[in-house]
C-alpha cells in the first residue's frame, strides 16, 4: 500500500481554479487594465491578459502533474503578481478616479460612497489577496516534496 501524497487534493483543486482564472482573463481579452496609474486597453491589455492567462494555465498544468517547474512557477507567479498589485496600490487614486468616472449604475453607486472609505476598502482587499497568494506560496514551500514525486 502506498502512502498518500500530502497536498495532492489541494494542489489539484488549485490547478482547476487556476485554469478557470486563465479563462476569465480572456473574457474580453482587451478589457482595460490598470498599469502605472492609467487604464490601458488595446495591445497592452491583450498582452497583459495573455501573460496572466499563460501563467495560470502553466500553474494549472504544473500543479496537476506535480512537476518541479510547477513549484518554481508558483514562486515566480507570486512575485509577479505581488509587483503588479504593488503598482496598483501605488497608483490606486488614478484607478479609483477612473472607476468613479464610469457612466451607469456602478459609477453612481461608487460616487455616493466616501472616497476615503473606497480607498481603504480597495487597499485592504488588495492586501488580503496578496496575503492569500503568499499563503499559497508558503503552503507550496511546506509541501514542496509533492513536486518531486513524479
Tell where the protein language model's regions lie, with residue ranges.
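Topology signature of small-to-medium multi-pass alpha-helical membrane proteins
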Residues: 1-150
Amino acid at each position: 500500500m502506498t502512502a498518500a501524497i500530502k497536498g495532492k487534493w489541494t494542489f489539484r483543486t488549485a490547478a482547476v481554479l487556476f485554469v478557470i482564472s486563465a479563462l476569465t482573463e480572456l473574457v474580453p481579452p482587451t478589457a482595460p487594465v490598470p498599469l502605472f496609474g492609467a487604464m490601458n486597453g488595446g495591445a497592452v491589455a491583450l498582452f497583459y491578459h495573455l501573460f496572466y492567462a499563460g501563467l495560470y494555465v502553466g500553474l494549472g498544468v504544473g500543479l496537476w502533474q506535480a512537476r518541479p517547474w510547477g513549484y518554481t512557477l508558483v514562486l515566480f507567479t507570486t512575485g509577479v503578481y505581488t509587483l503588479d498589485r504593488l503598482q496598483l496600490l501605488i497608483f490606486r487614486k488614478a484607478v479609483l478616479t477612473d472607476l468613479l468616472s464610469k457612466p451607469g449604475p456602478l459609477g453612481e453607486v461608487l460616487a455616493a460612497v466616501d472616497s476615503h472609505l473606497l480607498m481603504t476598502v480597495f487597499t485592504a482587499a488588495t492586501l488580503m489577496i496578496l496575503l492569500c497568494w503568499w499563503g499559497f506560496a508558503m503552503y507550496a514551500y511546506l509541501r514542496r516534496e509533492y513536486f518531486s514525486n513524479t
